[in-house]
Amino acid sequence: MVIGSGLDVKLNVAFSVLEYALLDAPGAPVKQALLDAHIGKDVYGSYEDGILQPFFSIVAKNADENEKEKFLSIIRGTLKDIVKNGMDRKAIEAGINYFEFRFREADFSSFPKGLMYGIDVFDSWLYDENKPFAYLQQLAIYDELKKLAKKAISKT
């Protein structure tokens, strides 16, 4: 599913956090619901934001193709339940903290920092020559997401 624009850094960071909370964190609700229904041997998500039209996907490895409707139904049902009843506050906070830590640490393993920063610059510069540093200026976004999460979670 296409999600917004690659130039919307806040939306992209927020969807990375959601992908973590829904599919990667321990006890992630969408992943757990699919595994409990025996849809595939493993479930994972992916949010690809280095392109103009970022996309979000959910993959069930070794799933039966005939269970496609069940797969979609479980995802929709789980997401509707989350919208109705709220989401685990700690999972959202953990996702924000995880991505903020990775951003601050800038540990790219064996890859040179300059190369990785260059790739980050191209994520926005390719589509808007006036915003080459958009993906390098994320600290304020993490602060804003923390406030939004606290506000939204306090309502549930």
Where are these regions (language model features)?
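Mature, solvent-exposed C-terminal subdomains and processed small-chain segments of exported/organellar
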Residues: M1-S57, N62-T156
